[in-house]
């Protein structure tokens, strides 16, 4: 492997390695919630995902003739995120393929640490969702006892997305929704835990609030002004204020929206790097996400939206840099002309 590239990756690891360490450990509370809802199977799935990601890291280090270092937890954090985006009933081989796709195709093919244009966790999830939709987008109800190794006989459904798509409102109280007591990917339903994790990442300066806030605000505004619930779009805002707000609540708490806002959107190498660029980036992901949710076939369309906007995040950065230079060059030129 090129020595200059190795040195550059080591510099990047010094700069952003703490982000992946924090994400890795903050996935543990969500895993605990998943085990509370579904038993020991989420622990088995996450363990297999971690093992797969770690073995990929060691294999790539061997093939590229570099020394493996356990300081880099990016593969492990991507693997955990992919596992938490899956239903607790997913077959083990599907999860393994998703992790392999995310780590090898989403990350290593582009050069490894810090060189990838697309979020590797979103790549892994998208590959699994497109290849095995009947396993990836259908979920068991919480508190359903799951066999440890083979959960194929457990009843699963997509009732949450079916309800929202048909114009209905979730028949759940706010506390149940905040705690994640509904059929969803095993690590994405506990909103209170996810928000607490996001607060920790923010206080540790691992993430910038601009992208996440603009993403959630954009999604909320679209859900408020263009609701999917039957009859709300034709009614006035004031007469349907509470149902619209309930629709916003349902949209933001389902489809892994909060989870992606905290754990995927601010990934250091795929998110825009400047303040205004991050706000625009989050807004674009929000628009694309609601488009996928309203007109697509996957409940977790946010992962596909993220991949779509990842393709222009570098363009957003370059455009902002050019505008910044242009706006600061004009006053200096006028000053020189006046002198």
Where are these regions (language model features)?
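Membrane-interface helix-loop-helix junctions at boundaries between adjacent transmembrane segments
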Residues: 71-151
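C-terminal ends of transmembrane helices
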Residues: 7, 55-67, 103-114, 196-205, ...
């Amino acid at each position: 492997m090129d020595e200059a590239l190795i040195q550059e990756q080591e510099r990047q690891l010094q700069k952003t390695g703490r982000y992946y360490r924090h994400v890795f450990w903050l996935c543990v509370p969500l895993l605990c919630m998943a085990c509370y809802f579904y038993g020991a199977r989420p622990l088995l799935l996450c363990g297999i995902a971690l093992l797969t990601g770690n073995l990929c890291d060691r294999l790539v280090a061997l093939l590229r003739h570099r020394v493996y270092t356990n300081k880099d937890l990016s593969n492990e954090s991507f693997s955990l995120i992919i596992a938490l985006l899956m239903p607790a009933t997913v077959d083990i081989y599907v999860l393994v393929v998703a992790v392999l796709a995310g780590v090898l195709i989403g990350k290593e093919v582009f050069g490894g640490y810090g060189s990838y244009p697309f979020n590797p966790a979103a790549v892994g999830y998208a590959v699994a969702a497109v290849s095995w939709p009947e396993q990836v987008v259908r979920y068991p109800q919480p508190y359903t006892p799951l066999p440890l190794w083979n959960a194929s006989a457990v009843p699963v459904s997509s009732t949450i997305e079916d309800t929202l798509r048909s114009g209905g409102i979730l028949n759940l109280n706010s506390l149940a929704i905040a705690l994640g007591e509904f059929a969803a990917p095993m690590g994405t339903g506990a909103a209170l835990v996810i928000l607490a994790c996001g607060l920790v990442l923010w206080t540790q300066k691992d993430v910038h609030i601009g992208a996440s806030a603009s993403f959630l605000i954009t999604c909320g505004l679209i859900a408020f002004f263009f609701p999917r619930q039957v009859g709300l779009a034709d009614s006035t805002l004031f007469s349907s204020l509470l149902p619209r707000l309930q629709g916003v609540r349902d949209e933001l708490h389902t489809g892994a929206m909060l989870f992606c806002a905290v754990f995927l959107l601010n990934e250091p190498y795929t998110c825009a790097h400047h303040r205004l660029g991050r706000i625009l980036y989050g807004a674009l992901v929000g628009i694309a996400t609601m488009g996928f949710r309203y007109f697509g076939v996957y409940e977790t369309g946010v992962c596909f939206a993220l991949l779509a906007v990842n393709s222009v995040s570098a363009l957003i950065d370059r455009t902002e840099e050019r505008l910044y230079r242009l706006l600061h060059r004009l006053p200096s030129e006028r000053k020189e002309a006046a002198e």
